[in-house]
Amino acid sequence: GVSFSILSGLQGLSIFGPAGTREWFESLQAAYPNLERMESRVQELKAMDSFSIKGFDIFAEEALHSVTALAYRLEAEERVIVYSGDTEPSARVAALADGSDLLIHECSFPEPFDVTNHTTPLKLGNMLSNHDLKRVVLTHLYPQAEGHEDEMAQQVIELSGAPTIVGWDM
């Protein structure tokens, strides 16, 4: 996550997220007094909402998770990035990603894990098989995925046809 020492020096912060984001941020402000002094604006979104900010057109779509979750499509200068957030395989997220330059999609567990609220490589590859994607980055890997990263990316490639790599948190 973003260091709170960095956040405390910001003059203003715009936060966009699904229902519950305002309450979540207020709890952070209560726990970290420096955040209370920062001017902030929280805008809660729902599926099918769209807005523009600083040259980006942003579209929200429902993701499938244990709590309210959204995926986002960012468009600017003829480039498109889609970020899934936490989600099970979702036709809505796949449609949102269609034609994108980059899909950043969670892929928490390797095969043969049977999971809910998250995605495995075969389910992701199947979901994307009829969509046009230039590149996929797998994120949000759980410890069970350690040592299986290359295999997971290859499974998505074989089913979706999209070049796929595993992203790493810093």
Residue ranges and their predicted role:
Residues 1-83, 88, 95, 150-170:
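Binuclear metal-dependent hydrolase catalytic cores
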Residues 89-170:
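Cap/insert and terminal regions of metallo-dependent hydrolase folds
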